[in-house]
Design a protein with these regions (language model features):
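C-terminal substrate-recognition/cap domain of FAD-linked oxidoreductases
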Residues: 33-41, 225, 231, 236-408, ...
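N-terminal flexible segment immediately upstream of the FAD-binding catalytic core
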Residues: 1-70, 86-117, 265-275, 321-349, ...
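FAD-binding subdomain of flavoenzyme oxidoreductases
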Residues: 108-261, 461
Length: 470
């Protein structure tokens, strides 16, 4: 990541002026151009500079999204989809200006099919909204990124979360979707069948496309039954390597762990102070098991023995819902707790993912880099699938700190790629990781560019993201 890697996008002043007039007339108060609301719809969660759109539209239907996109296509004006703005790599920035399409009013749950374990929702529904709605059905949607993100945004970035080791990512949990493409036409990528061999997999093409190919306007999602019993707890370890070895042993023994999260010592200190946890300031694993009463108790006991064999413990676990909720709220608040380690600093949040056999090595080398460079950068990770996050705290007004932080992130990304991993497990490419995509995928980037040019020949759909250059 480097600010110098950000793709410049030329502004089309004449086209923008025309579209502003068209959308104001069509949407009335649901089209806003005030400075405050435009700034809110640019990227603000990390150090990438804010690049505001020229207007913000609040459509309520797929047909209105089509109208917006057609107007923008006619005048060659950029269109940037916006959910709740929780993405971390500059996805919602508008480097060439244009229109931000805020999907928050498209927040209906269109259908729930309990017997089929699926539901269909609009993109503005958040994961917490959906799970509140599902509570009385005995079902839940398991994907849980740290933020209460919109489901449309989660699909667009191919998000995952703490449950991915058991339930997968958005890639595995979206059955089909409807999207408005760059010409204003809609495409529905599939039916509700649990599997299909019918042609190209357009669902997977659009999942993770970050709004660069189309704007998602509905999704059909897989659901899971709420487990009969849940147990979970925290286990301290003398070091990161011991914790990672316990993770590998747990996975290899076939224990159906639902969550297994690594928190390094610095992150644990931040979480203790911010979330009032009473655990040691040492590397810890946050673990959870789903199943029957007998099953989760047996799994917890077995994990405790594995932890002890690797120098960890004691594993303190509970089946009390309130205690587990406090634990996982602290985990989901890790970003905010990290910021307290250096008040006033901005966070450069990054993530990588490596094969689980290289996870300990990657984390330990990263910690060595942090120490060598004198950075304040806590680590937290989805240890069960080899994915971890680093939040580098820095003074964004100090060019030397920015350069040092960017150097660190570059070394981390290249290390992950060299280990046969990826420069991003779940944040996406956006603006921040464009410079690493070719290192990871080589000629695959050229094929992506061909797809982009075929589906969006005017380059109006979230330009300046994913692909190097324009």
């Amino acid at each position: 990541m480097a600010l110098s890697d950000l793709n410049p996008v030329e502004r089309n002043e004449e086209g923008i002026a025309a579209v502003l007039g068209i959308l104001k007339q069509r949407l009335g108060e649901r089209f806003q151009t005030g400075e405050a609301i435009r700034s809110q719809h640019a990227h603000t969660t990390t150090y990438i500079p804010t690049q505001a759109p020229d207007g913000v539209a609040f459509p309520e239907t797929t047909a209105e999204v089509q109208e917006i996109v057609r107007a923008c296509a006619a005048h060659r004006v950029p269109v940037v989809a916006f959910g709740v703005g929780s993405s971390l790599e500059g996805h919602t920035n508008a480097p060439g200006g244009g229109i931000s399409v805020d999907t928050s009013r498209m927040n209906r749950i269109l259908a729930v099919n309990p017997q089929d374990l699926d539901c269909t929702v609009e993109p503005g529904v958040t994961r917490e909204d959906l799970n509140r709605h599902l509570r009385d059905t005995g079902l839940f949607f398991p994907i849980d990124p740290g933020a209460n993100a919109s489901l449309g945004g989660m699909a667009a970035t191919r998000a995952s979360g703490t449950n991915a080791v058991r339930y997968g990512t958005m890639r595995e949990n979206v059955l089909s979707l409807t999207a408005v493409m760059a010409d204003g036409e809609t495409v529905t990528t599939g039916k509700r069948a649990k599997k299909s061999s019918a042609g190209y997999d357009l669902t997977r093409l659009l999942i993770g496309s970050e709004g660069t190919l189309g704007i998602i306007t509905s999704l059909t999602l897989r659901l899971q039954g709420i487990p009969q019993a849940i147990s979970g707890g925290v286990c301290p370890f003398p070091g990161v390597e011991a914790a990672c070895n316990a993770v590998i042993a747990t996975i290899q023994m076939g224990i159906p762990v639902a969550r297994i999260e690594l928190v390094n010592a610095l992150q644990m200190r931040a979480m203790k102070n911010y979330s009032k946890l009473d655990y040691p300031e040492s590397p810890c694993l946050f673990v959870e098991f789903h199943g029957s009463d007998a099953g989760v108790a047996e799994q917890a006991e077995t994990f405790g023995m594995i932890a002890e064999e690797n120098g960890g413990g004691p594993f303190l676990w509970t089946s009390v819902a309130e205690e587990r909720t406090k634990l996982w709220k602290a985990r989901h608040d890790a970003y905010w707790s990290s910021l307290t380690l250096r008040p006033g600093a901005k966070g450069l949040s990054t993530d990588v993912c490596v094969p689980i056999s290289r996870f300990a090595e990657c984390v330990m080398e990263t910690e060595a880099d942090i120490a060598e460079m004198g950075l304040i950068a806590p680590i937290v990770g989805h240890a069960g699938d080899g994915n971890f996050h680093v939040l580098v705290l820095m003074d964004v007004n100090d060019p030397k700190e920015i350069a040092q932080s960017e150097k660190f992130v570059a070394r981390l990304n290249m290390r992950a790629i060299a280990m046969d991993g990826t420069c991003t497990g779940e944040h996406g490419i956006g603006q921040g990781k464009i410079g690493f995509l070719r290192h990871e995928l080589g000629h695959g980037v050229d094929i992506m560019r061909t797809i982009k040019q075929a589906l969006d020949p005017l380059n109006i759909m979230n330009p300046g993201k994913i692909l190097p250059g324009n």
